[in-house]
Amino acid sequence: MAFNIITPGRVYSATSLTFVSTIKAAFVKPPLASPSRRNLLRFSSSPLSFPSLRRGFHGGRIVAMGSSAPESVNKPEEEWRAILSPEQFRILRQKGTEYPGTGEYNKVFDDGIYCCAGCGTPLYKSTTKFDSGCGWPAFFDGLPGAITRTPDPDGRRIEITCAACGGHLGHVFKGEGFPTPTDERHCVNSISLKFTPENPTL
């Protein structure tokens, strides 16, 4: 195939110009897409999604909390007796109850996370705590997977325990008419909890 050289000052027909333009387009490579444009094309077919993270405060540091049950903490009762105070052991391990109105966290409504006093597992967010007037800390919901519910042998109440170590927290009551999203009251012993403020004082 022969090609004519276009020179200035010469008049060409529309057919000749069209032919030359077609040949030029066939041999000129289009510019490569920039990296940012390639990324846009790659991900534009489906929306981006990111896994949601739950965060809590545990031992002065932020920890992620998923929806699955926490890792089990198994200790012999002799070891629990050695690391807990006598009153903590009586309530957490022997399912006792503190006197109403005497608990450290009954009237505390600061922002933060309530963890198990035995093993440190995050249990409740402060945003779920409310004043029920019952004399014990009250929450309308626990963190996902953190609380185990077990009916008492008499069937009249439902015990709540730490899902990680089995420490006794208290009982949960439903249908009492409190204006909460769940209509539940987790009645928890203060001594079963350890509160970590969201913004601890330096």
From Swiss-Prot:
GO CC terms in record: chloroplast; chloroplast stroma; cytosol
Binding residue positions for Zn(2+): 116, 119, 162, 165
Documented EC number(s): 1.8.4.12
Residue span of the annotated presequence: 1-63
Gene Ontology biological process terms, A to Z: protein repair; response to oxidative stress
Tissue expression as described in the entry: Expressed in stems, young leaves, floral buds and flowers. Expressed at low levels in roots, mature leaves and siliques (at protein level).
Cofactor-binding details, from the entry: Binds 1 zinc ion per subunit.
Endpoints of the signal sequence: none
Reactions listed under catalytic activity: L-methionyl-[protein] + [thioredoxin]-disulfide + H2O = L-methionyl-(R)-S-oxide-[protein] + [thioredoxin]-dithiol
Description of what induces expression: By photooxidative stress.
Main localisation: plastid
Lineage top rank: taxon: Eukaryota
Cofactor: Zn(2+)
GO MF term set: metal ion binding; peptide-methionine (R)-S-oxide reductase activity
Entry keywords, A to Z: Chloroplast, Disulfide bond, Electron transport, Metal-binding, Oxidoreductase, Plastid, Redox-active center, Transit peptide, Transport, Zinc
Miscellaneous note of the record: Reduced by thioredoxins f, m, x and y through a dithiol-disulfide exchange involving both redox-active Cys of the two partners.
Purpose: Catalyzes the reduction of methionine sulfoxide (MetSO) to methionine in proteins. Specifically reduces the MetSO R-enantiomer. Plays a protective role against oxidative stress by restoring activity to proteins that have been inactivated by methionine oxidation. May play an essential function in association with MSRB1 in maintaining vegetative growth during environmental constraints, through the preservation of photosynthetic antennae. MSRB1 and MSRB2 account for most of the leaf peptide MSR capacity.
Protein name in UniProt: Peptide methionine sulfoxide reductase B2, chloroplastic
